[in-house]
Amino acid sequence: MATPEFDLGDIKRRMQGAVSSLSKDLGSLRTGRATPSLLDPIQVEAYGASMPMAQVATVSVPEPRLLSISVWDRSMVTNVEKAIRESDLGLNPMTEGQTIRLRIPEMNEQRRKEMVKVAHKYTEEARVAVRHVRRDGLDILKKLEKDGAISEDDEKRQAGEVQKATDDAIAEIDGVLASKEKEIMQV
């Protein structure tokens, strides 16, 4: 059986992947503020295939509570409208030629608290993913030390580096959550 390799860089990359995934998930959460990433999960039927909004239109934010969608192909305007209406965002598109405007309504206090709970759920999933990566790294180190490939001192030193990488990733996750929570609760 092959001896597993320990690569701290790989562990850090995998932890960073969990942080990036969290940022993407939180970016799609609706706040009272207009952001182009709000439309990222929406798929538009275009040319016989399902495409992300970014591949058929440009999304801009002319005002804090308004999204402006410039559809590149005039024939796609109704498809983009339909995709927005059928999404679970609860937004009502207003069309003016090839431009679709979306007014983002203010969220009430109860809805804000629900969004914060969802953000916490996503954050906990990211923390768990980071802890799994840490466990994998520590398991590899223990196996290497047990097999005599590294000394006990090296195992302890590298385990400390894995723990530091874990702490850094968790701190970054907490920072992302705090920022999103502030954005959601801002009236």
Curated annotation (Swiss-Prot):
GO cellular component terms listed in the entry, alphabetical order: cytosol
Keyword hit for Protein biosynthesis: yes
Span of the signal peptide: none
Keywords, comma-separated and alphabetical: Cytoplasm, Protein biosynthesis
GO terms for MF: ribosomal large subunit binding
Pfam families, per the entry: RRF
Record family assignment: Belongs to the RRF family.
Protein name per Swiss-Prot or TrEMBL: Ribosome-recycling factor
Species in which this protein is naturally found: Methylorubrum populi (strain ATCC BAA-705 / NCIMB 13946 / BJ001)
Lineage: Bacteria, Pseudomonadati, Pseudomonadota, Alphaproteobacteria, Hyphomicrobiales
